[in-house]
Curated annotation (Swiss-Prot):
Family according to the record: Belongs to the SeqA family.
A GO-annotated cellular component: cytoplasm
Subunit structure: Homodimer. Polymerizes to form helical filaments.
Designated name of the protein: Negative modulator of initiation of replication
UniProt GO molecular function: DNA binding
Transferase is among the record's keywords: no
Reported function: Negative regulator of replication initiation, which contributes to regulation of DNA replication and ensures that replication initiation occurs exactly once per chromosome per cell cycle. Binds to pairs of hemimethylated GATC sequences in the oriC region, thus preventing assembly of replication proteins and re-initiation at newly replicated origins. Repression is relieved when the region becomes fully methylated.
Region described as Interaction with DNA: 87-88
Annotated gene: seqA
UniProt keywords, alphabetically: Cytoplasm, DNA replication inhibitor, DNA-binding
Principal location listed in the UniProt entry: cytoplasm
One Pfam family this sequence matches: SeqA_N
Amino acid sequence: MKYIEIDDELYRYIASNTQQIGESASDILRRLLGLEVTAEAESIPERISEPSMEGVEEAAPVRSAVAEAGVFEELVDDEQLPRQKGAVGRFLYLLDCLYRQHPSAFDGVLAIRGRDRLYFSQSKEALLKASPSANPKQIGASPFWVSANNNTAKKRAILEEVLEILGCQKALAARIAEQV
């Protein structure tokens, strides 16, 4: 017995032509093609590798000792920040650093909202319910999600507000947010 991959449409077609319980795909195809249905001895399929079905080990995000220190000033020259991909990457990285520095106070970010927008949530679904175009992203390994569908200036304003909620001075918050 050989195994082949077929697309969903073909699979549904073959399955819809099943006439009896336990009928194999080979039997169905033989019947549909007008070929002789042969009684084949039950064979045990050999185990094959299915990379798409195997678990993928996700690489642990790079953590900066600077970000772990818990001092806002150290976020200004964090060497890991320039290595992040784009404004969204830097935005998420800084939010993750802040969560790791202040995990117990971080739920204060849930109060940050736009006039008709929800920026933070503890579930992807809540952000999508509030705005289907929110493009929710999880903040590192935290239980928090943020709407990433904002322009860079708005991301900076949101980050600045997060920093101030966590106790950062306004001028320093502006310097850190400017790095997004």
